[in-house]
C-alpha cells in the first residue's frame, strides 16, 4: 500500500510538473494596449520579454502621435503591430480633424489594426471624461468602414456594468443589431464588455462573429477597483462558470491587457500575466493556446512565434 501511494504521488507530481512547464512555455499576444509619453518603447519590449508576450497590438494616446506607434513597429517588426489611433479630442468633439486623421493613418499603409472605439465610457474621476454615443454615430461608422476595408477586427468599448435599466437594454439591443448587421466582420468587446457570464454566453450563441477581449477581467484589476470590472477568476483560477464557457467556446476569447497608464506598464503588467498564465494552465493546452495567442493571430493575421 505504501509503495502504491508513493507511485501515485510521483505520478501526480509528474503531471503537475508537466502542467507547470506548459504554463511557463505558453506565450501571449496582447491584442490591445496603448502607450503615452510617459512610457518608452524600450520599456514596453522589456516588459513583454519578462512576461512572455511575443507581440503587442499598440496604439498611441496622450501626447504621443500615431506615428510613434509606427516608429516602434518599424523598430520591432516581429513584436509590435501599430494600431490606428481613434480617441482623443477630435474624436470626443466629433471634429472634422478626427476623420482626416483616421483616413491619413489608414491610407499610410503602416498600421495593422484599428484601436478601440469608445461608445460608452464612464467617467473616470478627473482622468477620463464620459463618452456616450450610439453605434450608428458617424465616428463609429467611419472607423468601421476602414476596418472592413482593411480586414481588421473592430474593437468596441461599451462598459455595460456602468449602464442601468432602459439605457443598458438599449445598448445591448444596439450591440446585437450592430454585430448581426456587420457579419462576418469580427466584433471584439474590450474588457469583456463588462458583461456577466450569462450575457456573454447569450451573445456568443446569437452571433458567430462576436469576440471578447480579456483586458481587466481579472483580480489584479478588481483589487481596490473604483470601476465595475468583470472578474472571471477566484484567486488565480477561473470561476467555474467562466471556465466552462471559455472551454466550450475557446475561439471567442482573446487575451488583451489594454495598458493605458504608465503604472499599468510599470507596476501591474507582470501581475496580470502571472494570474492569466495560472488560470490558463487549468485549461486544455489547445484552449489555453487559442486564448493566449492563437485567436489574435488568426483574426489579425499575425505570424505565430517561431
Region locations from a protein language model:
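Sec/Tat signal peptide C-region and signal peptidase I cleavage site
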Residues: 18-23
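Mid-domain alpha/beta scaffold segments of enzyme catalytic cores
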Residues: 24-142, 146
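Conserved, mostly hydrophobic/aromatic
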Residues: 32, 48, 114, 147, ...
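Catalytic pocket-lining loop regions of alpha/beta-barrel enzymes
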Residues: 74-78, 84, 130-254
